[in-house]
Regions:
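Conserved ABC ATPase signature
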Residues: 130-134, 138-140
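ABC ATPase NBD coupling module
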Residues: 65-83
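ABC ATPase "signature
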Residues: 215-216
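Conserved ABC ATPase "signature" region
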Residues: 64-68, 109-126, 178
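A short, proline-enriched helix->beta-strand linker immediately N-terminal to the Walker B motif
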Residues: 149-153
């Protein structure tokens, strides 16, 4: 279990804000930090990793104190059993894929670990290649593989898939989910993609101006729990067109474009680019902005 009770003042585009977190993260959870840029999401990841220091508070992981402002305890990053994957994969350009993994190996005598991770991440065919010859998706798979070489208890993911196309993004989301389950890791992801949150997470912290405003499952945080229906889909509004007394919405959901009809009252607060929840009741679609 990760016990966080920290405070840090941040300088943002909105001025100074206080990042205040008093939460517990359970072992094996897949938690997403969701919110606007500058809300404190990445800073919280960096604080957990030991790359930034809170002004006050405490971080306890299991029975080990990682940070305690009163006791003057602050474990350096190399003593915290975490893996960190950034949007920028940060691979060593002069090393092959195998070389990047071997460099991260704690026990240099255990080369079998490299082969195991290459197989799990399905990148064995890339082992002799250097990063410059890899696609964006391949580089991120190697970055995740390199992180797994250290056997981390906690996997910190700072928008690692945001620069990828939708097809590769979906594939790597599945791979992250498999890695999370297979290794029993506690994962913390920063993401702006609601569909990604639903695919990966069992818990969400919604953060605004340094404060956690919502804490719950993706459905609890993003969807109106008063809505009942046979199904619920998250999508992005691509277009809104008037047709007689109705409106036709084109919505991108799960990499597919679907069309939904609605009356004016259904879409009064909905505009192009909004994320919406589509649910169905008695064959009638219900649209809810989220």
């Amino acid at each position: 279990m990760i016990k966080l009770n920290i405070k840090k003042t941040l300088n943002t585009a909105d001025g100074k804000i206080d990042l205040v977190v008093d939460k517990q993260i359970n072992d094996g959870e897949f938690l997403t930090l969701f919110g606007k840029s500058g809300s404190g999401k990445t800073t919280l990841l960096r604080i957990i990793a030991g790359l930034e220091t809170p002004q006050s508070g405490q971080i306890i992981v299991g029975n080990e104190i990682w940070f305690d402002s009163q006791k003057k305890i602050n474990l350096p990053p190399q003593m915290r059993n975490v893996g960190f994957v950034f949007q920028d994969h940060a691979l060593f350009p002069n090393m092959t894929v195998r070389g990047n993994l071997e460099f991260a190996l704690k026990n240099q005598n255990d080369k079998s670990k490299v082969n195991e991770i290459l197989e799990i991440m399905e990148i064995g065919n890339l082992a002799k290649m250097k990063p410059e010859n890899l696609s964006g998706g391949q580089k991120q798979r190697v970055a995740v593989a390199r992180t797994l070489m250290t056997n981390p208890k906690i996997l910190l993911l700072d928008e690692p898939l945001s620069a990828l196309d939708s097809a590769m993004r979906l594939k790597l989301q599945d791979e992250l989910a498999n890695v999370h389950k297979r290794f029993g890791i506690t994962s913390v992801l920063v993401s702006h993609d609601i569909s990604e949150v639903f695919r990966l997470s069992n818990r969400v912290f919604k953060i605004a101006l340094g404060q956690i405003t919502h804490d719950g499952t993706p459905s609890e945080v993003f969807a109106n729990q008063n809505i009942s229906g046979k199904f619920k889909i998250i999508g992005e509004v691509l277009s809104i067109k008037k047709s007689d007394i109705l409106f036709i919405l084109e919505i991108l959901a799960h990499n597919e474009i679907i069309k939904v009809t609605a009356v004016k009252s259904d879409i009064e607060n909905i505009k192009i680019g909004d994320k919406i929840l589509i649910s169905s009741k008695a064959f009638n679609p219900i649209l809810t902005k989220i």
